[in-house]
Design a protein with these regions (language model features):
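The substrate-binding groove and active-site-proximal loops of carbohydrate-active enzymes
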Residues: 7-12, 32, 174-191, 276-291, ...
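Aromatic-lined substrate-binding rim segments of carbohydrate-active enzymes
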Residues: 38-75, 227-235, 298-301
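Conserved small/polar residues in nucleotide/adenosyl-binding loops
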Residues: 594-603
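Hydrophobic targeting/anchoring helices
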Residues: 45, 63-66, 198-199, 209-216, ...
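Polysaccharide-binding and catalytic clefts of secreted carbohydrate-active enzymes
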Residues: 70-329, 347, 433
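A glycine-rich, often tryptophan-bearing local segment used as a flexible ligand/cofactor-contacting loop or short
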Residues: 514, 518-593
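A short, well-structured beta->alpha microelement
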Residues: 10-22, 37-38, 311-319, 478-498
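Catalytic domains of carbohydrate-active enzymes, especially glycoside hydrolases
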Residues: 17-44, 48, 200-212, 387, ...
Length: 604
């Protein structure tokens, strides 16, 4: 293999596959080796001349410390189920539907201060004098409840089994292992200990070139039920980034009292379809500042020890949003992330302020794919072809794979296919890197989140679609490989300076009405609707998908009905007769829709 056709590839390894690792390094042209969760790095491979990544867990893999400091174990806000009172006394079980291997109710801190019982029929907070918690039964007992009102309890729970470790253990059917407890690096004792622990790790691993942080401090929201099935997931969720220690800091800095409801949000947990309120946005900004400061401490130690600092974009990544200003202050050398499609590739490749970016391609070498009868080649093809067009728009600098290499060795056709992928990637990179791709227009995706959700719009879980949002996410996916200069803006951006629209050719507003993706009640602000109308009046384009600007207000459901020439019938206008049923079947839109085969990211 020529020198030009080697490099830019990272390969996983383990103690039991040393010769095979060396062979595949040659075949795939790999110039970096990594360990993974559940594997160990072989000493024999330290002399290969390859760059060595060490996966480093800032918040787990040290149960001795976690058990000795239970007060500094990480916590999560959870809302109980909805329960209807039929008399004045009501018992609400807190952990019903939640794995007790994953979470443990926190009674160490003042529950009357940090918990909240809410009458969901009125939205009012129930006085702390009207309820208490019975630790033995695991229930909150509400007194003087209003019959036939619904109630919930918002409470803090310790994360006693790291959710990612739990997922890996369940997926791989691990036996005879200890549950890894998630400790909180933000808190004083663990903060001090973690810096010493990191320095010691660097000193004891002189052969390691890159510390691959997986990740920093707070896991995205991931909960499992009693059967260890995924119950709730939000790849952008902040509900597992809380503790009384953190919340007291927030109160001191922001000047107002924190409510659990700022996180709980009626049980929606401020997922990306919810229009974020001021308090939640304040909390996000606070977390980004604090996480960036602490992450910088670790990166500085890494650099002092002569190593590079790489961050995995996922798992405990909350607070490190790479498109926000705070990210650049961390000082990372690189970012690596999982590539599930074109959107998630751009989520990595569009990151600025690092020396290089890397995409971990699928499938991950786990038994859920690599088993008798499994078809890893099919998954690898779909993954590569889906991401390929996005690479041509904005390439990542490296690719790699992860998991148990031993499993992949039983699939020779897969090994052959990955070899072809590595060669093709290097060829694409050599031709695309440093060039400016052709752009037809400048496009802005407009929603309530803006740049903080760049390339992640409509992504509930990483690169996974739901039937309800598949078409919306598909718009973002199409943009990832299309000839447009794409940016993501928020309604707040327009309110701050509507001149931001002068540099844009087309605005896209995509999603269901009354969600964060279309704006909801923000359309009651005439500044917004007037700015968009003026933009179109002066020659700009507006594309709405789903229920653009959808919100019932002042005689319209679609607030730009005059602009887009269509209104949604909600029943409110059935009294108006309609006579214009003329169809223009030869118009370019229906003609294109019927006959045109659009290019997709799935062309093989």
């Amino acid at each position: 293999m020529s020198e030009k056709n080697t490099g830019r590839v990272t390969i996983p390894t383990n103690l039991d596959v040393v010769p095979e690792t060396i062979e595949l390094m040659k075949r795939w042209g790999a110039d970096a080796i990594r360990d993974c969760d559940g594997t160990e790095f072989p000493e024999e491979l330290t002399k290969t001349g390859a760059k060595i990544y060490a996966t480093y867990y800032t918040t787990r893999k040290d149960n001795e410390w976690a058990k000795a400091n239970p007060d500094e174990v990480q916590q999560c806000y959870i809302m109980s189920g909805f329960y209807t009172a039929v008399e004045s006394e009501l018992q609400i079980p807190l952990m019903k539907g939640i794995s007790d291997e994953l979470m443990q109710v926190n009674t160490r801190d003042d529950i009357k201060r940090w918990w909240e019982v809410v009458d969901r029929s009125t939205g009012q907070v129930v006085s702390t004098k009207q309820w208490e918690y019975n630790e033995e039964s695991g229930c909150v007992c509400i007194h003087e409840a209003e019959p036939f009102h619904e109630y919930t309890v918002s409470f803090l729970a310790y994360i006693i089994w790291d959710p990612v470790h739990m997922y890996n253990a369940v997926t791989n059917d691990w036996k005879d292992f200890e549950h890894q407890i998630t400790f909180d690096v933000r808190q004083p004792k663990t903060h001090k200990y973690s810096m010493e622990r990191l320095r010691k790790f660097c000193e004891e691993h002189p052969y390691v070139n890159v510390i691959r942080y997986t990740t920093f401090f707070h896991q995205f929201t991931l909960m499992f039920d009693e059967l260890k099935r995924e119950k709730y997931v939000d790849w952008y969720g902040y509900s597992a980034s809380v503790s009384p220690y953190i919340l007291e800091q927030f109160e001191k800095e922001m000047g107002y009292k924190f409510r659990p409801e700022y996180i709980i949000d009626q049980g929606y947990y401020n997922n990306q379809y919810r229009v974020p309120g001021k308090e939640y946005k304040d909390f996000q900004a606070f977390q980004r500042r604090e996480v960036a400061k602490l992450a910088k401490e670790m990166v500085d130690i890494t650099h002092e020890c002569g190593k590079e600092a790489m961050m995995f974009l996922g798992d405990h990544w909350i607070g490190t949003e790479p498109f926000m200003e705070e990210f650049a202050t961390i000082g990372l050398d690189a970012v690596v992330g999982s590539v599930g499609n074109g959107s998630t590739l751009r989520l990595i490749s569009d990151i600025e302020g690092v020396k290089y970016t890397e995409g971990r391609f699928l499938p991950y070498f786990f038994p859920d794919t690599f088993h008798e009868g499994g078809d890893p080649v099919k998954e690898a093809k779909e993954n590569w072809v889906t991401a390929r067009r996005a690479i041509l728009r904005k390439p990542i600098d490296r690719i790699g794979y992860g998991g148990y290499l031993k499993l992949a060795l039983d699939f020779p056709e897969f090994l052959d296919y990955v070899e072809s992928v590595c060669n093709e990637f290097r060829e694409l990179y050599e031709n695309a890197k440093g060039t400016t791709p052709y752009c037809v227009k400048k496009v802005a995706v407009l929603n309530s989140w803006g740049k903080i959700r760049s390339w992640g719009c409509h992504m509930v879980h990483h690169a996974l679609y739901q039937k309800q949002n598949y078409s919306y996410a598909g718009i973002i996916e199409a943009l990832s490989g299309a000839p447009f200069d794409v940016k993501f803006i928020s309604f707040d951006d327009i309110l701050k300076d509507k001149d931001i629209l002068k540099d844009i050719d087309v605005i896209i507003n995509v999603g269901d009405g009354d969600t964060a993706h279309t704006g909801g009640a923000v359309w009651e602000n005439a500044v917004i609707s007037a700015a968009i109308r003026e933009f179109v009046y002066r020659g700009g384009g507006f594309i709405g998908v789903g229920e653009p600007a959808g919100h019932q207000y002042q005689g319209h459901y679609l607030q730009l009905a005059d602009l887009i020439g269509v209104e949604k019938e909600t029943g409110f206008t059935l009294n108006y007769d309609k006579y214009n049923w003329e169809e223009h079947k030869n118009h370019f839109i229906p003609v294109s829709y019927t006959h045109l085969t659009l290019p997709t990211n799935r062309e093989v």
